[in-house]
């Protein structure tokens, strides 16, 4: 279903934020062009741009509070772009709720996923549960990224990692 009308001042601010984030992503990619982890880590930054861009482009802001989520996504994207430009990726060592992304081998698009990393995790192999909970008609990538950065979910086994893939339509 179509989303709600985003007020013009918000739309203008978000559009400007998207331009800044795109420039920051491009600078980071250029600075890290020889980094062997570029292909693995760049989607973790790009997903924030895509989430906001697609929400605006395809009228997928389904509730006005998602405008605030878009501001947060742009801020996190800028933070990650700045870190990655310096060759750092602190989100890869983060505990708790972590938003990541990968580049699809099907179509080359950037796809989000969420992780819940237990505080006790030290890098050794641990149980990992994959929660395939699907998606509703109004769960845009923006809403998913926001949800995965704020909500653990209903299932969190002690000491286990939980992976929340985004249910995409193919």
Regions found by a protein language model. Name each.
Residues 13-20, 27, 44-51, 69-76, ...:
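Charged, amphipathic alpha-helical oligomerization/scaffolding segments
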Residues 125-170:
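Active-site machinery of serine-nucleophile hydrolases
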Residues 50, 111-113, 127-128, 160:
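Residue-level detector of short, conserved catalytic/binding motifs and their immediate flanks
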Residues 2-5, 26-33, 54-58, 162-169:
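Acidic/histidine-rich, surface-exposed loop or edge segments in extracytoplasmic proteins
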Residues 1-45:
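Amphipathic, heptad-repeat alpha-helical segments
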Residues 38-63:
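Amphipathic, non-membrane alpha-helical rod segments
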Residues 59-126:
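A domain-start/cap signature at the N-terminus of enzymes
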